[in-house]
Design a protein with these regions (language model features):
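Active-site helix-to-loop segments that bind/position phosphate- or nucleotide-bearing substrates
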Residues: 29
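Solvent-exposed loop/turn segments connecting transmembrane beta-strands
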Residues: 33-42, 66-73, 108-113, 144-152
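Sec/Tat signal peptide C-region and signal peptidase I cleavage site
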Residues: 19-25
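Gram-negative (and chloroplast) outer-membrane scaffold detector with strong preference
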Residues: 48-118, 126-130, 134-136, 155-163
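Subset of outer-membrane beta-barrel
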Residues: 34-38, 125-133, 139-152, 162
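Positively charged n-region of N-terminal signal peptides that target proteins for export
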Residues: 1-6
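Bacterial N-terminal signal peptides
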Residues: 7-18
Length: 163
């Protein structure tokens, strides 16, 4: 009888892993800083869907140009994949992300570059109340073509609504 219960355990565990998990979606509105080459405000929105550990997100962000510092304006349109903790740990859900998309960079109505780019980063989502969360995110971009700054970085804080 004992051998039978041990042989049923792997089968039952496999069924648990193969059972469908509910998908979740979320939207994040954020403000942050792009310090490359000088600190400027970045604002944007991300919309995502998650399946327990894996998620996908489309994100739009805009950084204003600073003509006095010769810091270009930057628009990014990125599609990202996320790997995240399946459940919050002490009210926090950690994630890593990587993605690709299109960017547009301008400065002083003289310089303009549109091309593709990639990004990697990570962050944390903190549970507040119900579906409302705070999100903190850090990204490093690699911009192709001839941008003025090919490796901009970004840190943001945002309000995230899970539905």
């Amino acid at each position: 009888m004992r051998a039978l219960s041990f042989s049923l355990f792997p089968f039952a565990f496999s069924l648990l892993l193969l059972s469908p998990a509910p998908a979740t979606a979320d939207i994040t509105a954020f403000l942050g800083s792009n310090p490359t080459p000088s600190a400027r405000l970045v604002k944007g929105v991300g919309v995502g869907v998650g399946l327990v550990i894996v998620g996908f997100e489309f994100e739009y962000a805009h950084t204003n140009e600073d003509r006095e510092e010769s810091a270009p304006g930057l628009w990014t349109y990125m599609f990202n994949g996320l790997v995240q903790t399946p459940v919050p740990i002490a009210g926090m859900q950690f994630y890593g992300t990587a993605g690709a998309g299109v960017f547009h960079e301008t400065l002083n109505d003289v310089f303009s570059e549109t091309n593709v780019g990639i990004n990697v980063g990570g962050g944390i989502k903190l549970n507040l109340a119900g579906p409302l969360r705070l999100r903190f995110d850090y990204r490093v971009f690699t911009l192709q073509g001839s941008p003025l700054y090919s490796k901009p970085q970004r840190f943001y804080a945002g309000v995230n609504l899970r539905f």
